Amino acid sequence: MSQSYNNIDGLLLLDKPFGITSFDAVYKIKKVLNVEKTGHCGTLDPASTGLLLVLMGKATKLQAKFMKKDKVYLSSFLLGMVTDSGDLDGKVISENSVLNINIEKIKKMVEMFEGEIFQIPPMYSALKYNGKKLCELARQGIEVERKPRKVTIKKFEVLSYDGDIVKVRIECSSGTYIRTLAQDLGNVLKCGATVKTLRREKIDIFDIKDALRFKDTDSADKIIKKLIPL
């Protein structure tokens, strides 16, 4: 009979790997610890990696609080391509030349996205419309009108530009869609853009460098040692 950790209340910093859902990552921990209450703060798509805050026990009551915290992402955008999902998992809509694009032009254009901006949420998202997730409607070929949402981009740093790949670091408010930011940057550059890679590095004061590697979640002891009491 497996040991139960239902009396555990705390926060775990987890480094979610590529290819699994945030739900499955949390479920793995729930199963290993045999803990009843678990949750996470901010979904990462299967193709995205990085920091996932996993809450256990009474700490799950703090989910809404942590969901509102600022985040930092490291991402690479593929210029010259537009997809229906805003990332490489989607259907290619158009491909365009990037011959007239250089890093100086990119750096100048990202300045217009710093501060408070409005974003139209992507169809491929977990937001709901009349009770149905937008991503479910998108898979059926249905597109509905979405209201713009105000978000804050505190820092939009261009790290490098090589060929058609621009690497960026973004510090932003909760609710920011990096895929939408990539698409909007592609629009002002007049070449289109889509997210190639996305990694979440920070949520508020919590940093990916302090996170538990997913391969270590097989061990209840390693999970417990990384748990932050709340």
From Swiss-Prot:
Active-site residues, as the UniProt record annotates them: D45
GO biological process, one term: tRNA pseudouridine synthesis
Domain of life of the source: Bacteria
E.C. number(s) listed in UniProt: 5.4.99.25
Keywords from the UniProt entry: Isomerase, tRNA processing
Molecular function, one GO term: tRNA pseudouridine(55) synthase activity
TM stretches of this protein: none
Classification via CDD domains: PseudoU_synth_EcTruB
Catalytic activity: uridine(55) in tRNA = pseudouridine(55) in tRNA
InterPro entries: PsdUridine_synth_cat_dom_sf, PsdUridine_synth_N, tRNA_psdUridine_synth_TruB, TruB_C
NCBIfam families per UniProt: TruB
Function: Responsible for synthesis of pseudouridine from uracil-55 in the psi GC loop of transfer RNAs.
Family: Belongs to the pseudouridine synthase TruB family. Type 1 subfamily.
HAMAP family noted in UniProt: TruB_bact (MF_01080)
Cross-referenced PANTHER family: PSEUDOURIDYLATE SYNTHASE TRUB1 (PTHR13767:SF2), TRNA-PSEUDOURIDINE SYNTHASE (PTHR13767)
Protein's name according to its UniProt entry: tRNA pseudouridine synthase B
Protein's gene: truB
